[in-house]
Amino acid sequence: MLFLAGVSSLMCSNQTPPGASQDPTGGAASGGSPAAGNGGSTAAVGAGGATSALNPEGGAANGGAANGGAANGGAANGGAANGGAADGGAGIEAGAPADLGGTSFGGASSAAGGAASAGAANGGAASGGAAPMGGVSATSASVFTRSNDLQRSGSNLKESVLTPAVVRSAGFGKLFCKPVDDEIYGQLLYVSALDVGGQKRDVVFAVTMNDSVYAFDANDAEAAPLWHVNYTDPKKGITPVSTGDLSGLACSQYRDFSRQIGITSTPVIDPNTFTMYLNARTKENGVFVQRLHALDIRNGEERPGSPVKLEASVPGTGTGSVDAKISLDPLLNNQRAGLALHDNTVYLGFGSHCDGGSYHGWLLGYDARSLSRVVTYATTPNGWGGGIWMSGMAPAVDGEGFIYLTTANGSADVASGGGDRGQSFVKLKRQAQALLVVDWFTPVDWSVTNLEDRDVGSTGALLLPSSNRVIGGSKEGVLYVLDTNDLGKFNENDNAQIVQTVPVTGERRSHIHGTPVYWKSAGGEYVYVMPEEEHLQQYQVKEGKLILAHESEVTSPVDHHAASTTMPGGILTLTANGGVAGSGLIWATTPIAQDANQQVVSGVLRVFDANDVTRELWNSEQSANDSFGNLAKFNPPTVVNGRAYVPTFSGQFCVYGVGATRR
């Protein structure tokens, strides 16, 4: 269902929009009168711009036809071919395959240490400079993918407006908020100078747990959405998955998500084709479905052949196998990791819900044009678990096309030469119709941490652009620094074979959920991380190792409730004007005080001096007008072109910059 006119904006509100928390179905709001169409791609615009409370029926409100547009982008059972290519195997052990080239996301040639998104080298938001992109600006910054680039640096190095002095000024604060129909789990994406309806606009994109996608003018506080598409139709029995559907299958009472489970991952945008790729989950008259959608970012219309069902099976005797095959389960498999786009292939990683049921970790690759499935990798084909969730991070890709990811609780038979890779760093290479496992690292204590839910896979992988290093954290409170040319595989005695093990929490018990971020400044190279119940930590990179340089005086909140630690710590974004000394800022979203594990809690945005993180410059609790509401767990702020865009679980995202009103 596509709406080209919609709800009005919520100006500078510190409160939850009407119905956003209370409404059990979180329906889409819309002005205008969508006409019935195929795939949500056809809409007639009626009296647009009408303000609407969230519709408790889940359909269009204020005059929009409740059944307008075919639900889910086509036939209820998937429309286009279900995944296309044949299963691809469970992953093949191999030596390093032939180089497939370093074509980066967006078409730029690869740089040393990792291809940059759409031409942004060595981290930072994509600027698009390597190739003409039509309506997408080649000079302003954009954010097309989770944490800004394929290295997952979390850095926008084209920020010249927001400086430490500006953030400290009296005029910096919340400018406005924009309402959406549910919680926002995927990172907000941003495209500068996009041609929408013949007008150049900076556009911010939001996806919600009510299976909605929104496009907003990033600078207009009052405008309705440029377009809005929703993949549900309650009158036809098509809704998001609910947490109740998982109770008893994943934990006795499932609470990792609060109500609905729609779009849980960060989409990815190809600026050369103006296409967004995303996964939407639905329950259709009792049948659970996940679909890959390809949308035109200029109008929300489906691309030809979109959507396709996400389905896969590979040979294996692991848990849940039937006839010596394991299969992706559309209910049990949680597509939490952000999507990645590389070399014309869209990658989706799958974990679990609360380690429940007979699940396995999966990485599926789809051709970006045909949407046929071209590669399949299962992490534990002959075992169990090994989910790829990474607290929402997307797989990293280096300049040679190698893919890096981490896996969570599960079996790891690496000591005996098997292929199950739970609790591991995994390095993959696309070769023809297969994903080859070319290297891995499994910590010596994996079986102990497995039993205690202290898995490796709680962060993604950060590739350092300046060297052959990859870094990731764990629920054990440890950062692992690995050599990308030799990850270390497995040593039954210790972890001495890897570059470095860095305990970042006092008793190795506080989890790390935020993948570290990176900055190469005039004063040196730095990596930043903010674990649960810990200070923001700044490490200098020297000779390929991490040396603690500074710790903030502010901790991520400490929850003294018995048997609980404050989750998830700080989820970070870095901005700077290249490597200019004194230009760097660390932006962190954290809970204000409570633990965000299995509950929704209030959040705070904090800004630190990236040159010396002992200096907190500003936070959103200093003025009542700056609060954004409930924390979007695991979701970083998107900071670009002089503004910070903060997702929330309060049915809105909020925008910060210069020109805030004080009261």
Q: What name fits each language-model region?
A:
Residues P503-T505, E551-S564, I592-N597, S623-F628:
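Short, contiguous acidic/charged loop-to-helix segments that flank catalytic cores in large enzymes
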Residues S140-F490, R508-Y539, G569-A576, L585-Q594, ...:
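Mobile, glycine-rich extracellular loop/lid and propeptide segments
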Residues T16-P17, D23, S33, N55, ...:
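Intrinsic-disorder/low-complexity coil detector
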Residues G134-S137, P557, A581-G582, T590:
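Short, intrinsically disordered, charge-balanced linker/junction segments flanking boundaries
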Residues N485-V504:
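Surface-exposed, extracytoplasmic segments of Gram-negative outer-membrane nutrient-acquisition systems
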Residues M1-A5:
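Sec-dependent N-terminal signal peptides
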Residues V7-T139:
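Ser/Thr-rich, Pro/Gly/Ala-heavy low-complexity intrinsically disordered linkers and tails
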Residues D494-Q497, Q537-T575:
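A beta-strand-loop signature enriched in Asp, Gly, Thr, and Trp
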